[in-house]
Each structure stands twice: as structure tokens, then as C-alpha cells.
Amino acid sequence: MERRTVLITGCSQGGIGSALAEVFHQRGFHVFATARKTEKMKHLRDLDRMTLIPLDVTQESQISAAVELIQKHTGGTLDYLVNNAGDGYIIPVLDCDQLHGRQIFEVNFWGPLRMIQEFSPLLIAARGTIVNINSVASETLPLWLGIYSSSKAALLALSETLRLELKPFGVQVLSVMTGAVQTMIFQTNYRLPPDSAYMTWEKQIAAQAEGSEKASRMSATVYAERVVGDILNRQGGITYRGQMASFAYWVVALMPRFLRATPLLAQVGSQ
């Protein structure tokens, strides 16, 4: 029996991708772990069945090189593609730097699309599965995350369309709506632009950006174990994992949008 294969983007130490790589490895997979810089994956280097690949999902040449490498290794198949690499951006929409905002979409939306397009022949050959790591923010639309939430909402729409378009080829598409998870992606010394109209709320926004707000978070390892279980046992669709993810599901499913906005408005008041 041939060993199953998985490619995971964004596997820098301390993040979700790294935890996913370790859990897949424990399940007996050959893991192709990627990050912009391989030194950020040195904790994975000595594991057998673990191939580290330098990959920036915004660079088509690096994606093409990864396709060629994996084709040679597997004979032209890939069982699972996990699009995990992503960037956050906590900023009031009025203060958004548009170049930075476009870069968020390059990583969070166009990056996964590039990966899917380039690896589709390998996935179709294996009748494989595409997994897009998304966020409950794409549905709950929290304050100060307008650009990030928009990029993830676009990814969700793309995933649901792909789920239908790829079904004739036997390829499954799974979206993982992620709640709060303990990672190392937070910013430090957060500051709003000096002319921001939101200076009254800078301390509150900074706490969110720096991860110092009093919110409970699921460990990345527990999250990864549950997500890998979903990946191996589901036939595509949408799953919710991470702290408060199930709560977010029920809020979106049962609560009218105008009621969902009420607690958000309470955070900023009205003028």
C-alpha cells in the first residue's frame, strides 16, 4: 500500500500549520511542509517522511518548483493539499493601508487559488482533498478585522464553488472555520496611525492585535488533532474547530444579522 501524502503551507514553528504537519506525520503520512523560510521549520527537519520546501504562496515560480518536486516524489499524485498559510491584519477599515490590504488578499485568497490551480492535476490523479483553513471571522465579522474577514469570506465563497466544480473529478473540498487558537502570530507594540479617528479605542484594538485580551484559546495541538480527524473522516463541506467556533456557528445559523451587530456596536458606542 502506497503511503498517503499531504502538502501543508505555512508550517513555521508555533503555528497551526506546524501542528497539522506533526499530527499528519503521526498518522503515517509523508508530509511536505512549506514555509517562506525553511529555517522556521527546523523543528521538523529530523523527522522521517517529512520534506521541507521553501514556498511563498504569492510567488508562482516557487509554487511551480514545489509541484515539480512533489511530482518526482509521488509519481504525479497528491492526496491532500492543506492551504493554511495566511496573514492577519487588525486595523479599522478607515485606517487600512491599501497596499497592505492587497497583500492580505494575495496571501489569504490568491495564494490558495494559485496552489489549487497548480496542484489540481496531482489532486485529480489521486482523487484527493483540498483543505482551506478559514476563520469564523469570515462569518461573524468582528470589529477591526474588516480586511482580514473580507479575504477569508472570499476564500469561503471560492471553496464552496470549487466543491461543486471539482466533484465530477472526485476531488473533495473542505473549509475549516477556525475559532481562537494559541499561535505565535500576534503583533507587538501595536499603534494606530497618529491621525486615526479611532484613537479612543486604541488600547482595546492593541489588546486584540497583541493577543493580550482575556480570551481563551484552544491549543494548536488539540486543534490540529481535531482538524486532521475531520479531514480524514469527512467528504468535504465545512467544519468548525477552535475555541468558540461551535458558538460562532450557532450564532450565524440562528441569530438575525441585526442582532449579531448589537454587541459589536456596544463596544464602540454611538455618536
Curated annotation (Swiss-Prot):
Residues that hold NADP(+) according to the record: 8, 34, 40, 56, 84, 148, 152, 181, 183
CDD domains (UniProt xref): 17beta-HSD-like_SDR_c
Classification via InterPro entries: NAD(P)-bd_dom_sf, Sc_DH/Rdtase_CS, SDR_fam
Molecular-function GO term, any one: triacylglycerol lipase activity
Keywords: NADP, Oxidoreductase
Catalytic EC class: oxidoreductase
Catalytic residue positions: 148, 152
Signal peptide: none
NADP as UniProt keyword: yes
EC number: 1.1.1.-
GO cellular component terms attached to this protein's record: endoplasmic reticulum; lipid droplet
Keyword NADP: yes
Top-rank taxon, per record: Eukaryota
One GO term of the biological process aspect: triglyceride catabolic process
Family affiliation: Belongs to the short-chain dehydrogenases/reductases (SDR) family.
Function: Short-chain dehydrogenase; part of the gene cluster that mediates the biosynthesis of the indole diterpenes penitrems. The geranylgeranyl diphosphate (GGPP) synthase penG catalyzes the first step in penitrem biosynthesis via conversion of farnesyl pyrophosphate and isopentyl pyrophosphate into geranylgeranyl pyrophosphate (GGPP). Condensation of indole-3-glycerol phosphate with GGPP by the prenyl transferase penC then forms 3-geranylgeranylindole (3-GGI).
Protein name: Short-chain dehydrogenase PC-15
Lineage: Eukaryota, Fungi, Dikarya, Ascomycota, Pezizomycotina
